[in-house]
């Protein structure tokens, strides 16, 4: 039992009979073991520095898979990267009150909180600007006219009076003083928009065909699939705090592409021809491991996914990444590096174990040729 728990039990010793004392001592030991399992401050296993206590309880709750992944590196004698330590010490979604206190004091965040607040879409931009940038989430890049007008009003009220369009069909506002950060976040939600998980080690804004629903050549309208994935992420805390950022894009097979092969997961609409083992019709071809700006394009896995199963398959892929992505080296923590280390087949085997069924494969000759399209025919 730790010094703290022994002291606590001793302090109470005059108030309880021997049986109650034994119970309290056991209880306090259990508390310490539980804190060690979570890497909590004041526990015997400090975050990022030591393995779990022998016999410590398994982590539970929505963050359990992330804690187990971190524990595996610690038990191998490795050190977690600083962002992993920050997440382990205090989960960003448990720190909203701290963000509010900083806003009241117009206080700039220190390094750990600067990382944590990115889970809310806030990036402190020092030394270039002594202010935050706030990035939204706009699935498939589509918002209502009154929401766009509302963002303009918020930029005038809480930011620098302007917003930038991002490469993921998104909007972000700059020059947000710390005192205005919380007011801006809550006003964004009043508009029916959000910024949750738009930065740091999270699944970023989902992209879809820019002309979805009006492209005369599209095989499928990507909007409902991007929207489903968007709300799936928002409502599952276990999908936050990945080893590194994660991008998903849906391409509808039209004249205007979404550049899905620059994403960690690319769902590319294809038409399967008759005469093969796969049911003919429109499917998503599954691409994995792209990284924007690295000249690493997502690889065709040979797998095809029914559109209505896209969210389920993407969820399984993300959970395998959560369990096996690198938590020690930020430069090697993207999905691509798991694929490089394992190979696609081993990775897909793990995904299929998560799903509980095999994913269909379609040979290249089963896929109908795509009509002419222009990969540069987009803005951003």
Predicted regions and their residues:
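Intrinsically disordered, low-complexity regulatory segments in eukaryotic proteins
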Residues: 2-17
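Extended, prion-like low-complexity intrinsically disordered regions
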Residues: 2, 42-48, 52-56
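Peripheral terminal and linker regions in Fe-S/redox and tRNA-modifying enzymes
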Residues: 52-380
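Aromatic- and Gly/Pro-enriched helix-to-coil junctions and flexible linker segments
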Residues: 22-31, 35
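Short, tandemly repeated low-complexity microdomains enriched for cysteine and small residues
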Residues: 36-41
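Structural motif
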Residues: 13-20, 307-309
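Short runs of predominantly hydrophobic/aromatic residues within well-ordered alpha helices
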Residues: 20-21, 314
């Amino acid at each position: 039992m730790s010094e703290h728990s022994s002291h606590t039990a001793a302090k109470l010793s005059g108030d309880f009979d021997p049986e109650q004392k034994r119970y309290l001592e056991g209880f306090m030991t259990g508390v310490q073991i539980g804190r060690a399992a979570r890497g909590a401050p004041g526990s015997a296993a400090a975050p990022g520095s030591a393995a779990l206590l022998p016999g410590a309880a398994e982590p539970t709750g929505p963050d359990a898979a992330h804690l187990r992944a971190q524990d595996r590196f610690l038990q191998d004698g490795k050190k977690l990267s600083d962002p992993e330590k920050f997440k382990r010490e205090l989960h960003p979604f448990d720190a909203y009150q701290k963000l509010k206190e900083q806003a009241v004091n117009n206080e700039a965040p220190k390094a750990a909180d600067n990382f944590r607040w990115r889970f809310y879409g806030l990036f402190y931009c020092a030394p270039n600007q002594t202010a935050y940038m706030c990035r939204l989430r706009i699935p498939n890049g589509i918002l209502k006219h009154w929401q766009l007008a509302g963002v303009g009003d918020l930029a005038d009220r809480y930011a620098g009076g302007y917003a930038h369009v991002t490469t993921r069909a998104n909007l972000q506002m700059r020059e947000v003083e710390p005192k205005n950060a919380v007011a801006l976040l809550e006003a964004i939600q009043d508009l029916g928009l959000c910024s949750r998980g738009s930065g740091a080690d999270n699944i970023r804004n989902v992209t879809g065909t820019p002309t979805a629903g009006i492209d005369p050549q599209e095989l499928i309208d990507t909007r409902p699939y991007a929207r489903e994935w968007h709300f799936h992420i928002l409502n599952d805390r276990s999908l936050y705090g990945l080893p590194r950022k994660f991008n998903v894009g849906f391409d509808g097979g039209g004249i205007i592409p979404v550049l899905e092969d620059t994403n960690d997961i690319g769902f590319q609409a294809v038409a399967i021809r008759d005469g093969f083992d796969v049911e003919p019709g429109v499917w998503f071809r599954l691409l994995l491991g792209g990284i924007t700006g690295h000249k690493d394009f997502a690889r065709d896995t040979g797998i095809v996914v029914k559109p209505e199963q896209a969210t389920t398959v993407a969820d399984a892929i993300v959970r395998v990444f959560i369990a096996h992505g690198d938590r020690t080296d930020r430069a090697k923590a993207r999905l691509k590096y798991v694929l490089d280390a394992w190979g696609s087949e081993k990775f897909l085997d793990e995904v299929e174990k998560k799903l509980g069924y095999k994913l269909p494969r379609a040979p290249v000759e089963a896929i109908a040729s795509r009509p002419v399209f222009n990969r540069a025919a987009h803005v951003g």
